Amino acid sequence: MKRIIVTGCNGQLGRAVNREYENNPEFEIINTDVDKLDITCIEKVLGFVEAVNPYAIINCAAMTAVDGCEKEIDAAYKVNAVGPRNLAIAAEKTGAKLVHISTDYVFAGDAKEPYTEFDEPSPVSMYGKSKWQGEKFVKEFCRKHFIIRTAWLYGEGKNFVRTMLSLAEKMPEVSVVCDQVGSPTSAKELAKAIYYLIDTSNYGTYHGTCEDMCSWADFATEIFRLAGKSTKVNYITSEDYARMYPNSAKRPAYSVLDNYMLRLIGGYRFADWKTALSEYFD
């Protein structure tokens, strides 16, 4: 039986990964979260990983609060950069594969067409900078790695979909940014891609998002449509949002990722974002 360590097991992706593997007797999932394993401590990581001797490590742990990363820079770099470095060192030492989840925020967000894996990152926020450093550490310390950049993730837990549905219960209308464009991605779809990659030797950096694109306001509109809500969506600009929340971190205006490498290695495709969102509501 192949053992797989999943960090951040209680998050959206961690839960989706567990569901993806739950009926496969070939794998044993070893779940960890911050209470069980502090990935920022190299001694604890090495001790844990060496004791388990896993086939693979799937790192779903991250500090994802974009505004929080601006305020707690040290914490952001510890979790998003030092943590992945420690896991990479441990994976290399034990011969394990490492799946590391990254983000569209490693790019500046000023492109006119989807970013491929061959475009050079240039993050503008502390969240993006810390995640980019994490990627570099993974590549430096672990040969058998899969770095998967994703975006606008939703699943079980706190996310944009749940936030919109909660607001719909309290308010007749909501204001949502219309000039930030990306690809909403279900944790279930991302977990399926991880499952596809992990048993291969196609190591490297990948983009993993649902197909097609929309604005946050379009996303909210589709959420309310599928939920049967009459909540009105007011389309506002990023400048409007910045005036409303002056201390918020800068967000990418265009962070659409092209899953180019997945197509190159075998034609794997994600569902389009509307189909995946519809399945989420079923």
Predicted regions and their residues:
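NAD(P)-dependent short-chain dehydrogenase/reductase
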Residues: K136-G182, K188-E189, Y195
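Catalytic helix-loop patch of NAD(P)-dependent Rossmann-fold dehydrogenases
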Residues: K78, G83-N86, K93, V106-I148, ...
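Conserved C-terminal active-site "lid" loop/helix of NAD(P)H-dependent oxidoreductases
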Residues: S215-T221, D240-F281
